[in-house]
Amino acid sequence: MKTMKPSASEFVTLRGLRHHVRTWGSASAKVKAPRAPRLFLLHGWMDISASFQFLVDSFQQDWHVIALDWRGFGQSEQRNEPYWFPDYLGDLDVLLDHYSPDEPACLVGHSMGGNVACLYAGVRPQRVSKLITLEGFGMKESDPTLAPARVAKWLDQLKTTPSFRDYANRDEFIQRLLQDNPRLKPEQAVFLMENFSVENEDRNEEKQGSLEKRDKRLGYDADPYHKLTNPVPYHLDEAKVFWRAITAPVLWVAAQDSFIMKAFKGYEADYAARQACYRNLQTAMLEDSGHMMHHDQPQKLAALIEGFLLAQGSDSVSDPMSDTND
């Protein structure tokens, strides 16, 4: 793997919780093109800020990149109790006040991070100058008839202590990462293991009449309470109201082979209706990429992001359901 751009870690208290914030570049970094402020990268569910390393390494400009670990992920403080989606918007609001109090921000959000960014940009349109959503396209409309069962499942989950699977050693953790994403390069998997695993010392277990301390095992550095079912249903019509309120130019990036795009097969009208909510939209499709596009195609994704951020403005919209790239 080529030499990685160095990052620095900071810890900032956001709404009472200690958050880890990873930065690349300097606060005074400037680009030649106008309207290129600091760049905020927002990771998805079960991911971390370090996951953007490959994307940052592919940028050609000297950005001041700011990426937090969302609450309960990575090195940010864990609640050890259920998480609520609106809290991410509150955390982002304070994060921008801290790092970019006097100018609107450029936001890049992947998956859950993209959904947070798109809602936030509708609530605080004056705080966002440009928005890039990497398959943060909203979720499936909740079936109201399943609401009682959904809440019942959540109540049952509250009676147990959640946990993630752990792994015997580094190699086993790496193999799981490679299994989850066949496009992941071995050196990428090693980097992710080093940044997203934590040692869990097993409790003493009785073995053949004596207590024997087992070796430490590796687990995900995330709060298992993130696994709990969200008892609050998702209302697509409400999300669309947020999206329609966005004033910033938006780049909508899809990955050709992702489970997100596969889920929209046969639902092209729904897909188009979501896109139609954005008043200033450009789209792009990444070929030979799954959902983790910042791992699968970091160079191509970096080129898309920088091309969009540094452009003087464009109203063109391409069809991401086609096989052509923007």
Regions flagged by a language model, labelled:
Residues M1-L39, Q60-W63, Y99-E103, G138, ...:
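Alpha/beta-hydrolase fold catalytic core
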Residues T23-Q78:
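Conserved HGGG/HGGXW glycine-rich cap/lid loop of the alpha/beta-hydrolase fold
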Residues L89-P104:
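Conserved acidic catalytic loop of the alpha/beta-hydrolase fold
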Residues E103-A147:
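Conserved hydrolase catalytic core segment
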Residues A168-M261:
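Alpha/beta-hydrolase
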Residues A245-S289:
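Conserved loop-alpha-helix segment in the C-terminal half of the alpha/beta-hydrolase fold
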Residues L286-P298:
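Catalytic histidine-centered segment of alpha/beta-hydrolase-like enzymes
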Residues H295-G307:
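Post-His helix in hydrolase/transferase enzymes
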